[in-house]
């Protein structure tokens, strides 16, 4: 039995979590800038 490469799934998961982390930081930065500059 040949299984799919588990390393590929781990890389995809890390890329997805990195994307969501950056998106979360971006949204928080917008919210904080609106809060401080108004």
Swiss-Prot record:
Domain of life: Eukaryota
Protein's UniProt keywords contain Transmembrane: yes
Spans traversing the lipid bilayer: 17-37
Subcellular location: Plastid, Chloroplast thylakoid membrane
GO cellular component, one term: photosystem II reaction center
InterPro entries: PSII_PsbL, PSII_PsbL_sf
GO BP annotations, alphabetical order: photosynthesis
Membrane topology designation: Single-pass membrane protein
Keywords, comma-separated and alphabetical: Chloroplast, Membrane, Photosynthesis, Photosystem II, Plastid, Reaction center, Thylakoid, Transmembrane, Transmembrane helix
Function description: One of the components of the core complex of photosystem II (PSII). PSII is a light-driven water:plastoquinone oxidoreductase that uses light energy to abstract electrons from H(2)O, generating O(2) and a proton gradient subsequently used for ATP formation. It consists of a core antenna complex that captures photons, and an electron transfer chain that converts photonic excitation into a charge separation. This subunit is found at the monomer-monomer interface and is required for correct PSII assembly and/or dimerization.
Subunit details: PSII is composed of 1 copy each of membrane proteins PsbA, PsbB, PsbC, PsbD, PsbE, PsbF, PsbH, PsbI, PsbJ, PsbK, PsbL, PsbM, PsbT, PsbX, PsbY, PsbZ, Psb30/Ycf12, at least 3 peripheral proteins of the oxygen-evolving complex and a large number of cofactors. It forms dimeric complexes.
Family of the protein in this entry: Belongs to the PsbL family.
Name of the protein this chain belongs to: Photosystem II reaction center protein L
